[in-house]
Amino acid sequence: MNAPHLLEKILRGERLSSEEAYALAMSIAKNEIDDVQKAGFLVALRCGRERPEELEGFVRALLDLAVKVGPFREAIDTAGTGGDRANLFNVSTAAAVTLAAMGYKVVKHGNRSVTSAAGSADVMEALGYNLNLPPEKATEVFERTGFVYLFAPLYHPAMKNVAHVRKNLGIRTIFNLAGPLSNPARPGYQLVGVSEPWMLDVFAKALKNLGVERAAVVHGRPGIDEVSPTSTTEVYFVDRDKISYSVIDVEDFGAKPLESLEPLKVRDIKEAKEKFLRALRGEFPEAVFLGVNAAMAIHVIDGKDVSEAYLEVVETLARGEAINKLREIIEASGGNPTF
């Protein structure tokens, strides 16, 4: 790869093919170009807004470099880009645990916080989950419980070669977009939240090209990377090689809209843990937020109507099955529940 030539191409306003993006991501991750060039590429790609082919190429590279586990094609991952600055509790992870309690297979892939008060890994660790699961143990936990949480730094060791560049830049880069799509277990189903509306189309096309079975890419009002519990949510559905667009209202789930996101916000890991547990116990208003997101995931997996799925989620929470599943998952990981 000719780094200066490729950088000039981007600066001329041209974009990279998926093959060029793959080669670039590989060169960055393998330290084949220096830090100045790495920063130049990341900023240049960001300036023109990343394209589906570029995102696809970076994701393919990350997956090829990742520590192998699975694949678990029957599973779903629920993830988001982050960066919405809303500081809401970790609803996608709470929804993932609830899905497992309902019998759905889940492989959650996540990391510590970058922009929020607490990342999914921070919360899982605070709850007692053992993050340090090698592939063999992760497979065992998945087969035993139907759920496993994969701590991204363990499975993407090559990312350490760009970590300091990303930190020093202090801005979102294409790696922030590629992360939610780079689950090393390669689940066939995905619910992905994006922080900006323009990302909807980009993610949907990338997911289609990556060969996902079914997925939903969501952006909720007022600007969150989750299904909104207060208003409407834009959704791009991916069904193998087809992409469709819709807008769904919280009332379509059979839920009463929350008046505000304020009760869902957290300031630190302690609050994040408390609201996470309240959601799994079916307490208001956290359970509404969990419910609409879990229902959307169920719709992705089996096409069930979101109102029917929402009711099933609410009943699961009321029976205490989600909180019990969380204990089971933590114990299977070799951890000790802290609640």
From Swiss-Prot:
Which chemical reaction does it catalyze? N-(5-phospho-beta-D-ribosyl)anthranilate + diphosphate = 5-phospho-alpha-D-ribose 1-diphosphate + anthranilate
- Stretch forming the signal peptide: none
InterPro entries noted in UniProt: Anthranilate_Pribosyl_Tfrase (IPR005940), Glycosyl_Trfase_fam3 (IPR000312), Glycosyl_Trfase_fam3_N_dom (IPR017459), Glycosyl_Trfase_fam3_N_dom_sf (IPR036320), Nuc_phospho_transferase (IPR035902)
Record note on cofactor = Binds 2 magnesium ions per monomer.
**Listed GO MF terms:** anthranilate phosphoribosyltransferase activity; magnesium ion binding
Q: In which pathway does it act?
A: Amino-acid biosynthesis; L-tryptophan biosynthesis; L-tryptophan from chorismate: step 2/5
Q: Where does the chain bind Mg(2+) 2?
A: 225-226
Task: Give me the residues that bind 5-phospho-alpha-D-ribose 1-diphosphate, please.
Answer: 80, 83-84, 90-93, 108-116, 120
Which Enzyme Commission numbers does its entry carry? 2.4.2.18
**Binding of anthranilate 2: at which residues?**
166
Q: Which residues bind anthranilate 1?
A: 80, 111
The answer to whether UniProt assigns keyword Protease to this entry is no
Give the record's GO CC terms.
cytosol
Family under the similarity heading: Belongs to the anthranilate phosphoribosyltransferase family.
Stated role: Catalyzes the transfer of the phosphoribosyl group of 5-phosphorylribose-1-pyrophosphate (PRPP) to anthranilate to yield N-(5'-phosphoribosyl)-anthranilate (PRA).
The protein's matches in PANTHER family, at most eight in alphabetical order, are given as: ANTHRANILATE PHOSPHORIBOSYLTRANSFERASE
Record's protein name: Anthranilate phosphoribosyltransferase
Organism name: Ignicoccus hospitalis (strain KIN4/I / DSM 18386 / JCM 14125)
Q: Which gene encodes it?
A: trpD
